[in-house]
Amino acid sequence: MKLPLLLSVPHAGLRVPPEAEPYCILTPRQIAADGDEGAAGIYALESDVVAYQTTAVARAIVDLNRASDDRGPDGVVKTHTCWNVPVYRSFPPGDVVESLLQLYYWPYQRELSRLAGRGVILGVDCHTMLAQGPPIGPGPGVDRPWVCLSNGEGTCPQPWIESLRNCFQEVFAGPVTINDPFQGGYITRTHAAELPWVQLELSRAPFLDLAAKRLLVLTALTNWCDSIG
């Protein structure tokens, strides 16, 4: 039986869409470093859950976990990566930015809304995080836990996230935190109006390979669903 979960994996993509290609100056390595490296492997759980959504588009080009009007350096269409590397030789004109949103951003958000009504009890926005904070992000240079679960602004019931933390702590030997260093993002805050949501951040530190991390994530999620009944 599939787990009654909706998994969102918004930052696993590596593709620069054609609308942005004439402007983007990032190398493939820089694009990968700005995204959630390892997420495509760790969260390859589509066959295990009721609903699943991901994208091939790189986070550096369209960040699906930002508000559509967030036009800062690390906003929905970025000027710089999380390593403070310029994304574009010259920033795309307004019509190109709007095309990126219409073609890649809004369809993702609409699909999450549609999937929320598909017999799921919890949405999980799945990410990987650097072992230490990058220059642009919470806690630059600070060591991070193995797992961070977030429900900032009450995106899921507190007893749920506490029991979810316990399930992750049972299978991961390293620290599992709630709302530290992350407190959730646009996806969890916005779509919590439709369904309870949590944000899941798994460290990229090499304490396990991707397959082992995937198995532990699946085990923790399965145990949590069993505990909820």
Model-identified regions with their sequence ranges:
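N-terminal catalytic or cofactor-binding beta/alpha core of small enzyme domains
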Residues: 1-229
